[in-house]
Amino acid sequence: MRRAHRLFTTLLLMLAPALLAAQGGTIRGRVADAAGAPLARALIAAEGAGLRATSDEQGRYEIRGVPAGSYTLRARLLGYVPQTARVTVGEGATVQQDFALAAQAISLSPVDVVVGSRARHTAAEELAVPVDVFTAEMLGQQGTSETGQILQALAPSINFPRQSVTDATDIVRPFTLRGLSPDHTLVLVNGWRRHQMAVLNTFAYGMGAGSSGVDLNAIPSGAIDRIEVLRDGASAQYGSDAIAGVVNVVMKEGAFTPFLNVESGVYTTKDYPDDGATVDINGGLGFGVGRGSLTLFGEYLHRDPTNRAWPDSFLVDVSGVADLIDPTTGRIIQKRNALTQPNYHWGDGLEKDAMTFANFRLPLNDGGTSEVYAFGGYSHRVGTGNGFFRYFDSEKNWPELYPQGFLPEFHPDVADYSAAGGFRANVNGWSLDLGAEFGTNRFDYNIENTNNASLGPCLDVACAPGADGILGNGDDPGIPNQLSFFAGRMERRELLVGLNAAKSLDLGLPSPVSLAVGAQFRREGFEIVAGETASWINGGHLDQFGSDPAPAGSSVFAGFSPSDASDHSRTNIGVYLDLESKLTSQLLANVAGRFESYSDFGEQMTGKLALRFQPAQRFVLRGAASTGFRAPGLSQSYFSHTTTNVIGGQFIEVGNFPVDNRASRIFGAKRLKEETSVNVSAGFAFTPSDNFTLTVDFFSIRIDDRILLGATFGDTVSQRILSDSGFATIGAVQFFTNGLDTKTNGVDVTGDLRVAAGRSGTLDLSAAVNYTKNEITRVDPLPPILQGTATDLTSILDLVTQVGIEEERPDWRGTLTAQYTNGRFHSLGRVSYYGGFASAQPSFTDRETYGGKTLVDAEIGYHFQQANLSIGARNLFDTYPDQPKAQFNNNDNTFPWAAASPFGYNGRYLYARVEMRLQ
């Protein structure tokens, strides 16, 4: 704490004289076409300064508060050739720079909004569906390099809950959009589909269990030019998964001055020592290659763990003596044994990431009518996660190995690779794009600080007797116990080949018809690799008490066995048609249709109609209706694993089996089919003045036959049925099901205002509010084999899953951000509101509600000649979520904070960042 305070005091003293002297200059001018007519809504950006402006109806623009220095000024507008100019700005000076843009029919240059319309408008407010655009400057001011966390701070419709004691999800966290599952959001990179992560979230907070999302944190944050979030169903345009919407990550391109960013921070919070120290280093360079460019980026992240666990009042030594602990504060009143407290871990794990990315673009002629392009990246992550503590007298422990008990750890190795490339050309008025993309994500389960209790207390020699209980016979496993294991691997692969064509047609309507057609071929693969033998085998040894067989498999995560191992793939062919045009001078219409055929479950057709009506120049009404679908994930169809759950305070072996497994069929499992959806939205965009925009959008999403991980069939009746059916070693069964329908209703409100502040300052105010309510409208009944029995279950979904779908995400989310710029000085303040939510834990299902919380973030900084220095705080006032009261929701008072908290439970984070231009 003191070190952090000294650091920030020093930085403030360094900044103070600079803040007092902050002035900056102004760039202003006019944008016109070749004939001198003014061009409205052209984007003018001062590259390197992070400042931009939009031209008004007279073509005029002004960028104020520009730090002294030289900049490349870029002006661009859809339908015109982009233009750049080099300007030098002095302190307090005003520079005039006009642009005359030449018209072109179809441009291959990137534009401001890609998703939402194949016609590619330049302003989100012009679209018939809501799209948020977050620039690199906005992304870089959040005090974190985690893209998922950045999006959650900027877009209230996105949720990115922190995870702890959730197996692999501790290390690869998914995000959700509009309260749906991670796999209901399609992620694109430069307009190409991004592959999903290999991990299946069988344990997760803030979302329904059993989905696989996209690991946004595998992309270097410094390589991102902007992120576009389409908040509307788009399966008819982009294919499976786009039920909640689309996130398009657009990477930086072109020649630019090399940069290097270094950010360091630490959590300094009440009642806990400083922890979670983080260092992030990222940089990039872009240089010309012939007519084109090549950009290279790299990033390294090191984050120490955080721990918010309280001491354990049940932790006893061999004499049976426990510490005396205050249950209201978690403080140790009297230390009465020599055991280390806390013995649990409740917080972020250690994380180390290395990431690279490259983006290449080469026009093949001077007119820029044809080009080749390529982009891709590689990332590698190692980290830690934890399970539940195993006490010294647990049947999962051997005192000879862990005299004081042990806390098992996940040490995964995660690799992610992607590559894409293609050819674009303008041919006879057609804009053609032929390309391919390949991506893979691999997750290795390495388990440490654990053991396989069934192999006995021996590390040097084999002492497990096998199934017959007699050491020395032929069924002995013949291997000693271990303290670490390779428990297996999951890998996901995806190959996509696509051809897209677009043309502007004159059909006698008030404006040309934008026609887009295309076809795609996709091949997906999902593989489970078995762990080493010692990680899954049952050695047959009795437990330390000599009464019952010891639990088999590496404790906390039993390895994938050979029977779990599999390698499955499928293919998909899709074709689409997209038409957009103005039917009148005020009414724009967009119609899209898509047909897809899957090799494993069949065919699906979807459609979309979107309308935009503009009764006045500054007011737009918009609405859309679409059908969508999501194909069953390969991991949902073929995942198989026996793992350890804490159910009713006991360790139970739970079998997660494919739906075609006989143990699943006993309880009514059926072959998975596609989810189908209907999405309706309506709203308006209002720009009463050039510096203010307000949007309001209502939405309703109905999903039928939704796929989720069903209830755990593990009560006494289910166990008897399993035993009678020949599955005596299985304590419980879970499988995936299409067994429910859901309805999601909500509204998004956004507002942006820019005003002058003083002689040379600028104040940008932005607000965003999201309300989302999920409701389960249908649940399948109990399987016939359980109907009429004394089972504890009431449906194929348990209460924990129902709460996870309907209540574990705040209904209300809102942000209010103020950004002030004056010369070299810049500052940012944000107020974020997270509404109340509810959560429950397995078996006991003690549903608890937690109140809403308000967090404050702040950042100030100063632009030096070649560097930008910033300091800031996330959660400035050290706000924590409410504490669970029920014994089984707080793990007997060792997990003191709500597990499903949407903003985590790490407390205040202080950071400093320096951004350097290397010229």
What spans do the regions from the language model cover?
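Outer-membrane beta-barrel transmembrane domain signature of Gram-negative proteins
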Residues: E400-Y402, F406-A419, A425-N426, A436-F438, ...
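Outer-membrane beta-barrel translocator/receptor signature
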Residues: G206-V214, G222-D225, A236-N248, K252-S319, ...
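N-terminal periplasmic accessory domains that precede
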Residues: Q96-F99, T147-L154, F175-T176, L188, ...
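Extracytoplasmic beta-strand/coil segments of soluble accessory domains associated
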Residues: G148-A198, D241
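Short, acidic, small-residue-rich periplasmic hinge/interaction motif at the N-terminus
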Residues: A32-A37, A42-E47, R76-L78, G90, ...
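Short acidic/polar hinge/loop motifs at secondary-structure boundaries
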Residues: W192-R231
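C-terminal beta-signal and adjacent terminal beta-strands/loops
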Residues: K773, V831-A840, Y862-Q919
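Short, acidic Ser/Thr/Gly-rich low-complexity loop/linker segments typical of extracellular
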Residues: A49-E62
